[in-house]
């Protein structure tokens, strides 16, 4: 009966870290920290640009992050020419991020202030960039507190910030001297593009409801809840998705139901 059919969604933010890694075909154990950082940064970018009362806190964090990246470049680059070239590359990338996400005048002014100290004469910056970074008005304590905040399993974040978060983490790693990080994560980033752009993943990207947590999702989609003693038969038509997406879908739903049952007491 067509009237009993509803569109199936599996919101991406309900995936745990290991499920993301499986979907992105991460082949190395050391790629796990990279993607964990991407998710954390994505959550913070979502907070920065959603325009609530916390945006000042997260903008301060973004400034702190940029300053640290530039500080690492200055510490590791051997010549002023190399330092300034790399620093201006970071500034250009950050400007692109801001223009893509939000016309934030505070961040734009911040980047312009740094860029004005990137002049070079006969291969010498005369310490202008270092002086500029040391004088920036950044609340260090607040930034460290923001940095310690963690994306909790099931918390909502906007997938549109994932690519931005990847860019920032890559910039951080390159500033620290990890010149092969893009090569190391190329498969993951290709799979991320697949998630962001492929119609096969639309059921993960464009859920009609923002669920508070896994239990909220299970109740709405499958009728699984403490107040419901019935056991409905749910059939998911997965004929239009690829085998890798089907494998992910099966794994995530099975894990959520198992975790839900594990939390129950007695005969529940």
Residue ranges and their predicted role:
Residues 1-3:
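AAA+/P-loop NTPase substrate/partner-engagement loops
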């Amino acid at each position: 009966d067509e009237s009993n059919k509803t569109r199936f969604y599996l919101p991406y933010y309900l995936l745990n870290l290991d499920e993301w890694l499986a979907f992105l075909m991460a082949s190395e154990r050391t790629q796990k920290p990279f993607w964990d950082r991407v998710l954390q940064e994505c959550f913070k970018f979502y907070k920065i640009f959603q325009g609530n009362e916390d945006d000042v806190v997260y903008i301060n964090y973004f400034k702190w992050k940029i300053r640290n990246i530039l500080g690492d470049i200055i510490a590791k680059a051997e010549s002023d020419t190399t330092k300034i070239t790399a620093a201006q590359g970071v500034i250009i990338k950050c400007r692109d991020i801001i223009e893509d996400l939000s016309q934030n005048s505070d961040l734009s002014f911040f980047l312009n202030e740094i860029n004005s100290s990137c002049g070079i004469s006969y291969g010498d910056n005369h310490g202008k960039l270092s002086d500029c970074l040391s004088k920036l008005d950044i609340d260090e304590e607040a930034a460290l507190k923001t940095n310690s905040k963690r994306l909790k399993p099931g918390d909502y974040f906007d997938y549109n910030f994932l690519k931005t978060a990847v860019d920032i983490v890559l910039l951080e790693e390159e500033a620290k001297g990890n010149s092969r990080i893009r090569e190391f994560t190329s498969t993951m980033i290709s799979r991320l593009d697949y998630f962001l752009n492929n119609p096969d993943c639309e059921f993960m990207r464009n859920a009609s409801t923002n669920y508070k947590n896994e239990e909220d999702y299970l109740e709405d989609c499958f009728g699984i809840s403490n107040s419901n003693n019935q056991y409905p038969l749910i059939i998911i038509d997965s004929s239009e998705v690829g085998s890798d997406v089907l494998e992910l879908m099966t794994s995530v739903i099975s894990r959520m139901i198992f975790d839900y049952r594990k939390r129950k007491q007695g005969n529940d």
